[in-house]
Amino acid sequence: MTKFVFVTGGVVSSLGKGIAAASLAAILESRGLKVTLLKLDPYINVDPGTMSPFQHGEVFVTEDGAETDLDLGHYERFITAKMRKVNNFTTGQIYESVIRKERRGEYLGKTVQVIPHITNEIQDYIHRGAEGFDVALVEIGGTVGDIESLPFLEAARQLSLRAGRNAAAFVHLTLVPYLASAGELKTKPTQHSVQKLREIGISPDALLCRADRQIPDDERAKISLFSNVQEDAVISVWDADTIYKIPQMLHDQGLDRIVCEKLALSPKPADLSMWTKLVHSLENPKDSVTIGMVGKYVDLTESYKSLTEALRHAGIHTESRVNIEYLDSEEIENTGPQCLAKYDAILVPGGFGKRGVEGKIASARFARESKIPYLGICLGMQVALIEYARDVAGLTKANSTEFDADTEQPVVALINEWQNHDGKVERRDANSDLGGTMRLGAQTCAVKPGTLAAEIYGSEVTERHRHRYEANNHYLGRVEDAGLIVSARTPTESLCEIMELPRTVHPWYVGVQYHPEFKSTPRDGHPLFISFIKAALAHKHAGQAKK
């Protein structure tokens, strides 16, 4: 039978519930338990796919094509289990499901209410995602006290009651702020947060107390007394310079022991040696590179969370510190790309919309002409294709129909029909809904022998997608004749997956239509990013040799 650990948050949002839950899951997995994580989001959107990155941050895509919360990216980076659609659901999905059942008459004429119908549906979703695992950690989004979170907290309380003794544990993450004017940590917000949770009928088994410093024993004793939580279960979680230190921090204070005792589990001792090695590699690099990332969401770096982590993972596996500088593509559009000359490599990530796109195109051209390593992801590949078509292949009016619906030379265009991850044919047009109508999830394709892509991936590549627009096959022949290499295509539609420049022309210039960052983990890194960082190191050293 699956055991449950519910992770809640109090006082303020963005305390790091996802990191805390993923870190605890990593410790439990190291103890030999089969572990998964679920994220319950209390917003009414069906999924985050149509939400602005400024509102929500990154949208993480699973192997089976779900557009999910960025916390699922943390989950995959901390444990070995792959996330699926069932690992993330929202208030919107719950209500949509209940209303469909009501319309079909499944409630037999009863008045449909939050309790029991909504809360039962939430529990059904939780059980579905947890099936087949020893322990499921369930992160409840939002903050205790928010009206949106109440049905999820009530469902967690009911599930705990129904599951019986030793079947569920509650871990509450809260803030202990430091008041500089008073020169002390303040525990009152935590006391009130726990009190609010207990009013709902939930008594936490452990408190994770976030602060900018370690919390002294006397303050932990005070929190214990007023929150009715054992003193050894009041865990101090202070700011760390890398999230990969958190598993060791929680283990050193016995959080996994407390949870295992509550759940009546007796697994083998934890082995966190892998995390120790990762942290050592991060803290003891032998070299460094600086990457210029040209995007439109640079004011909120959460929009590129998986990408940032993927670059850091590549740094771990190349013994290098990867410094990332975020550059606004609109500023480059206005002032020119000369500011990119100082970087060891240039990366243009995915994105949507016309704003700042000419700055990205200019960045791709600068990287190509200056022989600076370039990686274009999704839109980053498309702008590189547009630039090459305009400036090399003679298609001077080349553009994407995303930016100019009436362009005379649509080298990038809307996909009307494609196969999803399980082979089902999907169709859309310009009038289709925005939500859930993209090419989503993992797909496999063959790689052209003798290319840089083949050197990186081998003969085959499986990566995750999230896009509506593709390179237009009608124009690819012209661009290939001008020297660009299409080094991977989809097997059915022959859509461009990877493009590159010959190494006789440029040392490392690659564009990919998919999102490789979603598959990178600190354990293994990702071959594309590792190759990219190696190219950046080579460019840096070549520049130093010339001086």
UniProtKB/Swiss-Prot annotation:
Disulfide pattern: none
Secretion signal, residue range per the UniProt entry: none
Residues given in the record as CTP binding sites: S13, D146, I147, E148, K186, T187, K188, P189, T190, Q191, K222
Keyword ATP-binding: yes
Activity regulation information from UniProt: Allosterically activated by GTP, when glutamine is the substrate; GTP has no effect on the reaction when ammonia is the substrate. The allosteric effector GTP functions by stabilizing the protein conformation that binds the tetrahedral intermediate(s) formed during glutamine hydrolysis. Inhibited by the product CTP, via allosteric rather than competitive inhibition.
Pathway as given in its UniProt record: Pyrimidine metabolism; CTP biosynthesis via de novo pathway; CTP from UDP: step 2/2
Protein family per UniProt: Belongs to the CTP synthase family.
Protein name, per record: CTP synthase
Source organism: Janthinobacterium sp. (strain Marseille) (Minibacterium massiliensis)
